[in-house]
A protein has these predicted regions:
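Divalent metal-dependent phosphate-bond-processing catalytic cores, especially two-metal-ion Mg2+/Mn2+ enzymes
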Residues: 2-9, 19-47, 60, 89, ...
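Short gly/ser-rich anion-binding loops that grip negatively charged ligand groups
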Residues: 26, 67, 71, 87
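An active-site-proximal "capping" alpha-helix that borders the catalytic cofactor pocket
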Residues: 36-40, 72-87
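His-Asp-centered metal-binding catalytic motifs of divalent-metal-dependent phosphohydrolases/nucleases
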Residues: 50-68, 77, 98-105
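Hydrophobic alpha-helical segments of small multi-pass membrane proteins
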Residues: 81, 102-103, 125-126
Length: 180
């Protein structure tokens, strides 16, 4: 099995620019992203860094939670990444990065545009959100290694708290970020 990747420079640069918005959840969110990116690389059989589109999407994929204070965070996250790509004249990445973000909570497998990156990213996020209960064939030992290298720092607890608050506010729409 591959060795975990220890640094994702593009992701870190983006997270640094949003550190104030993310606040005390920064380390937990960063480690979530690092776990997801490592699971993505393992699922794809990548050795080394994933492409720039993936690193950018990973940094922004849940960011709307903090910038817009909502669990319905996919549209705000796409808005933020669109502004980011525009400011760097990287418009050619918009479609793929948007698909990566918008479809990462899709309940069923993803088979549309950019499926070669979107589907493993969706699976990698699910591996992390499920705390490794869902593995998509990754060895349990690899998942545990990545989890120990990049500890939770309260990330899953924060998600549970936000989900409970969302359920109380909107019991008919408790998990707005999920897609069929």
């Amino acid at each position: 099995m591959m060795n975990p990747v220890l640094e994702f420079p593009v992701t870190d640069e983006i997270l640094t620019s949003f550190a104030l918005a993310i606040g005390p959840d920064l380390q937990g969110y960063r480690n979530h992203i690092y776990r997801v990116l490592n699971f993505y690389c393992a699922l794809r059989g990548n050795d080394g860094l994933p492409g720039e589109a993936l690193q950018i999407a990973a940094a922004f994929h849940d960011l709307g939670i903090w910038t817009d204070n909502t669990l319905d965070y996919l549209p705000p996250s796409v808005r933020l990444v669109t502004d980011y790509l525009d400011s760097r004249q990287r418009g050619e990445l918009k479609d793929e990065v948007s698909a990566l973000i918008l479809e990462h909570h899709k309940v069923r497998s993803y088979h549309s545009a950019y499926a070669l990156t979107v589907e493993p990213f969706r699976r990698a996020d699910l591996i992390d959100v499920s705390l490794g209960l869902v593995r998509f064939g990754l060895p349990r030992a690899f998942i545990k290694t990545v989890q120990s290298m990049f500890p939770d720092h309260g990330f899953h607890g924060m998600l549970i708290k936000l989900s409970a608050r969302q359920f109380i506010r909107s019991p008919l729409h408790p998990l707005p970020m999920f897609r069929w």
